[in-house]
Amino acid sequence: MKTTAEIRQSFLDFFHSKGHQVVESSSLVPENDPTLLFTNAGMNQFKDVFLGMDKRPYSRATTAQRCVRAGGKHNDLENVGYTARHHTFFEMMGNFSFGDYFKYDAINFAWEFLTSPKWLALPKEKLYVTVYETDDEAYDIWNKEVGVPQEHIIRIGDNKGAPYASDNFWAMGDTGPCGPCTEIFYDHGDHIWGGLPGTPEEDGDRYIEIWNIVFMQFNRLADGTMEKLPKPSVDTGMGLERMTAVLQHVNSNYEIDIFQTLIKKVAEIVGTTDLGNKSLRVIADHIRSCAYLIADGVIPSNEGRGYVLRRIIRRAVRHGHLLGAKETFFYKLVPTLIEVMAEAGKQVKEKQANVEKLLRLEEEQFARTLERGLILLDAELANVKNGVLSGEVAFKLYDTYGFPLDLTADVCRERNIAVDENGFDKEMEAQRLRAQSASNFGMDYTSIIRVDGETKFEGYTNVESLAKVTALFRDGKAVESVSAGQSAVVILENTPFYAEMGGQIGDSGMLTANGLHFDVKDTQKYGQVFGHIGELTQGTLSVGQIVNAQVDAQRRQYTKLNHSATHLLHAALRQVLGEHVAQKGSLVSDVGLRFDFVQPEAVTKEQIMEIERLVNFHIRANHPVLTEEMGVAEAKSKGAIALFGEKYGETVRVVTMSPFSIELCGGLHVERTGEIGLLKIISEGAVAAGIRRVEAVTGEEAINWLFNQQTILAQSADLLKSDIPSLPEKIIQLQDKVKKTEKELQQLKEKAAMQAGSDLAKSAVKINGVSVVTHQLDGADAKVLRVMVDDLKNQLGSAVIALGSASGGKVNLIAGVTADLTAKVKAGELVNVMAQQVGGKGGGRPDMAMAGGSQPENLSAALIVASDWLKTMI
């Protein structure tokens, strides 16, 4: 019986034997594709190739792509573990043709791999295929060429209410590449319920789709017209877990080897013998998605990708709690995961320490509130009358205890109770940006400039070149010429201008010819061409014209300083903080650099100093900065670090600054590190959960920054009548003096309050025989108000007191009730009556409660409302 790892390797070996390039799985974080939250299909990494915006050195490819399908509030997460085939993480085997082979080969390849005794040897009589209703070509290939009998071929038409809206017609979007598809199904046997595709029983588990082959042969225009593509392509997907279930003769994906090993390990760790418990399946699934997401740079947080990861982790932790886990357990599954994933586990193994650390920290954080949240939820569920948990309670669990909505829904599902999601949405309105980041990932690919050919980049050695204008664009539309005063994007056949990539800003400069001047303000890359963005200030510029392209050399030099310094900074961060440090983003400009990186804990001042010291040591060492092109495998063997979010071809450019820093990089750099002069870190802090940011300046900017700091120190010393070395001691003396003065002032305030309290006791009024004091004391802080309430209680013996003060645009409120009256009046209720009038809220004990507010102009009205309310309560 083949293992999952063997089936994965067999697929890749088969297609390699058919002339396909074996391409590594791309990251779960889509590279340069903001339309996607996570990689969810094998074709994602080839999207630009299918769109004609990218070219590869091969026309056939095969992959074992890691995928995650979980995101947004409305998803299948709650079904994972409860059905046979729902997963947050899965592997999609795929083979792709980029204008190479088409239907005949794609169909025959799939059939050979599935049925040949050399490969999977599936019984042909167990296989059924579907084709798009009008795709006679695919039908005939299956029937006449492959030999599949007619009764095993099903035509599927437009079954989704619109033309070309069908299970057997695939489209990338409303416009763009699209085409019919053919799907292959496996019959698990009549002992399992379910019907053939296209029948009312098709959702059963008897006939399971194992392979989908998409024929991209049309380009759909905005008016719905279908144009034939000049070079049709093929995109296929075979679910590895589903295929393994077929070959291992089981009906559920959770019964295959990798899941059974994980399930048994979970049971061992949490101490259960019930291997059929669905919570084990949930945890076994979730460790795969969580470990690979963290390995690919995602950090648990409250927004976007990080929030999806947090939801999955917390769901797993909750199911561990159901199984009786008494301590952190989730991270302990990582070694077993690496083992069962075999070759595909190397991504997690390389980041194992960081993966385990982040999983443990997240579980520990959630464990602090999980028990209390479940107690609240259990109490609320016991009181549910109509079978629906209120959205208000669901939101409180989210806001106070960190329960994602789907976790609450998971618990409710076990009690056959629904959740009022509309009510939850209303409560979430003020925090709508959380968990909605997924919907903000969008880009209209039709607006991107497309030009055939490519621009030859000459900027590694030149800052000036003669170049031919191959295209001009205004407002996204191609034009033949541009006149003075007009903005445009100029495409050149060759250019010394660097287009923004890898965090480095695009070059600026000018294009000139006789009587012509075009100011280049930025340079961007569109597919394989460079767009020079700017304004024509003089003359007329036309397609076909020869111009002199001249980069702003000084701006570029400053940018080069910062780019090389960024490499040294990255290396220093990894050396001081640990190898878990990975780039999450960067900005390299002519005025400074910004570097975002993975770091779950705050960076200490001592660590910052050591990082800065290391960088400047290697600057002073004046290392040569060497660039070399080589294969990806060779670069990795030399220890080269790849940067986050960048795509690399088969040949990569490696930038080396002694053994200290070796990175893959296509950017511009100095010739020796000594040119950088100096690096000064000017800020460091958190930008998101688990992500830190360092900002720094170099060269002349660093010197200017230090001069400015020196000036500030000198001015501060003058103000304090001190010299600079004595400033810390002088400031400490000043702080001590201020503290002493503040203490004396507080004592005076309290003394005055005691006197005022005596006067207020005389102003008490009787409401139904109870002494009541309501008064406004502007300038009194919360501490003074507490002293006054205690004093009034002592003087009056039995009383209700409501005091308020306004200062600096803020309101302080306090309510006090003597013990004999708390059965009638509670201080917390009284203070909230007042707080509502001043835009605040508060709380406390029945005998003493405080509140704040932001509307001092309503304070007098609040005290009147308090008196009126007391008349109804006493």
Swiss-Prot record:
Reaction(s) the record says it catalyses: tRNA(Ala) + L-alanine + ATP = L-alanyl-tRNA(Ala) + AMP + diphosphate
GO cellular component terms attached to this protein's record: cytosol
Comment block on domains: Consists of three domains; the N-terminal catalytic domain, the editing domain and the C-terminal C-Ala domain. The editing domain removes incorrectly charged amino acids, while the C-Ala domain, along with tRNA(Ala), serves as a bridge to cooperatively bring together the editing and aminoacylation centers thus stimulating deacylation of misacylated tRNAs.
GO biological process per UniProt: alanyl-tRNA aminoacylation; negative regulation of DNA-templated transcription
Cofactor binding, per record: Binds 1 zinc ion per subunit.
Protein's name according to its UniProt entry: Alanine--tRNA ligase
Annotated function: Catalyzes the attachment of alanine to tRNA(Ala) in a two-step reaction: alanine is first activated by ATP to form Ala-AMP and then transferred to the acceptor end of tRNA(Ala). Also edits incorrectly charged Ser-tRNA(Ala) and Gly-tRNA(Ala) via its editing domain.
Location(s), subcellular: Cytoplasm
